[in-house]
Swiss-Prot record:
Gene3D superfamilies: Aspartate Aminotransferase, domain 1, Type I PLP-dependent aspartate aminotransferase-like (Major domain). Its cofactor is pyridoxal 5'-phosphate. Pfam families: SepSecS. This is O-phospho-L-seryl-tRNA:Cys-tRNA synthase. Homodimer. Interacts with SepRS. Belongs to the SepCysS family. It comes from Methanosarcina barkeri (strain Fusaro / DSM 804).
Length: 386
């Protein structure tokens, strides 16, 4: 590509077509910026802006109050002993896997684990044993499956796995497994547990200590109203010296974090939104009520919600047999749903999906959820003769 004036015109400021739409994309509902975060994005957008008064390590910066956020607020919020800011939940998971395990060790993952959990384990050189789920319609994860997996690893390798991970909730069906029971099972075998709370931390109450998780990973851009990439990591006192070990070449830098992580706008939008995030977590019961209301309304229309019932999270998976029938007959094919929703200013169902799809009701409130439900009903009626 020749970098002349003509070719460069495609870059520069780019407008976002979906801005202002009713957004039901699970990836985005929990990451919508607060007004304070939007201001912080501009105020702190210059590269290393937070380093005006840096003494050598990000989490020790007092002005702006990153130190207080990382070492006082986050441990209280996550209910853990020590915390750090990372470049995302996947980076949090990798830091734990890489520090706790050694190449050739084993990790146990749940059958609904996010792809990044697999990739992080692969990058850390770990072998993977998976705990199966029950399949459709519930996709239930039996905590005792962790005992079976741990025993299988021990039999095959001669020692227990270095780590176990549970996804809470999973990103496909929004199921909340019995994480406390899973932690108890893992600890019976002296296997530490990593809770992947990318869709939980910042949306709903989560306590690492109450669950018994040794590590907890959260996503700032997915669930804490922050500009990505940014995440959080909570660690128990027992494992903190291992995960947060210092470099022998630079005494203040932590190896697994490559010294410093989220600098500038990412960490400052996370901090800016934090007061609102703490408050919205207290409203979780209403979010669950809204999700259940929405699911019931959808099922009245013939959609089928898969996963836990009654559902306890905003992320939901639906089968849509009627939409699939329509897609096989109309001119627009499998893209008809995306286009009809776009015409109604609704965004979040991936283009081309009709047979099944997932969505999130988080933060929308009953009024907007009613608009979404009405729109789906209108689309069904539009094609009722097809």
């Amino acid at each position: 590509m020749k970098l002349d004036d003509s070719s460069l015109q495609k870059f520069g400021f780019i407008k976002r077509d979906t801005l202002g739409s009713i957004n039901i994309d699970p990836l985005q509902t929990g990451g919508r910026l607060t007004e304070a975060a939007k201001q912080a994005l501009v105020e702190w957008g210059d590269g290393y802006s937070v380093c005006d008064f840096c003494g050598g390590i990000l989490d020790q910066i007092k002005k702006p109050p990153i130190y207080d956020f990382v070492h006082k607020a986050l441990p209280e919020f996550l209910d853990c002993d020590e915390a750090r800011v990372t470049n995302g939940a996947r980076e949090s998971k990798f830091a734990v896997m890489h520090s706790i395990g050694k190449p050739g060790d084993w990790i146990v993952l749940d059958g609904l684990a996010h792809y990044s959990s697999y990739v992080a384990a692969e990058r850390a050189g770990l072998n993977i044993k998976t705990v199966p789920h029950s399949g459709s319609p519930d996709y239930y994860l039996d905590p005792e499956g962790y005992a079976t997996a741990i025993e299988e690893v021990t039999k095959e390798s001669g020692k227990p796995p270095a780590l176990a991970l549970v996804t809470y909730p999973d990103g496909s069906y929004g199921n909340l497994p019995d994480a406390r029971k899973i932690a108890s099972v893992c600890h019976e075998y002296d296997v530490p547990l990593l809770l992947n709370g990318a869709y939980a931390v910042g949306r709903m109450p989560v306590s690492a200590k109450e669950i018994g998780a040794d590590f907890i990973a959260g996503s700032g851009h997915k669930s804490m109203a922050a500009s990505g990439p940014v995440g959080v990591l909570g660690v128990s006192e027992e494992y903190a010296p291992i995960v947060f070990r210092k470099s022998k070449y630079n005494k203040v830098k932590e190896v697994e974090l490559l010294g410093c992580t989220a600098r500038g706008a990412t960490v400052m939008t996370l901090i800016a939104s934090f007061p609102d995030v703490v408050k919205r977590v207290r409203n979780w019961d209403q979010e669950v009520e809204n999700a259940r209301w929405f699911s019931a309304r959808f099922e009245e229309m013939g959609f089928i919600q898969r996963g836990q019932k009654p559902h306890s999270h905003d992320l939901m998976f639906f089968e849509a047999p009627r939409f699939y029938e329509i897609s096989e007959k109309v001119k627009k094919g499998r893209y008809f749903l995306y286009k009809d929703l776009k015409a109604r200013n609704i965004h979040g169902i991936k283009s081309g999906l009709t047979k099944y799809f997932k969505l999130s009701t988080f933060g929308l409130g009953k009024e907007k959820l009613g608009i979404v439900a009405d729109s789906f009903e209108e689309i069904l009626k539009k094609y009722e003769d097809v």
